[in-house]
Amino acid sequence: MNSTDRLLGVLLAVVALILLIRISEANDCDLCGRECVSACGTKMFRVCCFNYNRKRSNMPPLWMPRSKIWEGADDPLVLLQHLAKKSSGKSLTTTKDSSESRKKEISEDKALQFLWRNND
């Protein structure tokens, strides 16, 4: 094998490598939708891809108004009751007692029992 054949082999290998890199870059530009193709190869491409994927996902927004979550979210007891309802399907305050303080004591006891049982 003479030096011309070696040089030709190296040249073909470099051209093949460049083609493979170009093909992979072209596929990467298509991953984030049509609106990001124009930004391919720039700094804004990552931002465009991030926004595109966030739009497509079913993630909840990073911020949600309190009225959308539930009322009384500042009260830890309300939060505990909400968690208990989610896990058991029924309310913690099931007593027919008319005294609000008695209802609160019962619900606090049940909330603490719930936390104690699920403290694994």
From Swiss-Prot:
Single GO MF descriptor: toxin activity
Record localization: Secreted
Keywords: Disulfide bond, Secreted, Signal, Toxin
Free-text tissue specificity from the UniProt record: Expressed by the venom gland.
Residues covered by region (Disordered): 87-106
UniProt KW Translocase keyword: no
Residue ranges, compositional bias (Basic and acidic residues): 97-106
UniProt PTM comment: Contains 3 disulfide bonds.
GO CC annotations on file: extracellular region
Signal sequence region: 1-26
Family: Belongs to the scoloptoxin-20 family.
Protein name from the UniProt record: U-scoloptoxin(20)-Cw1a
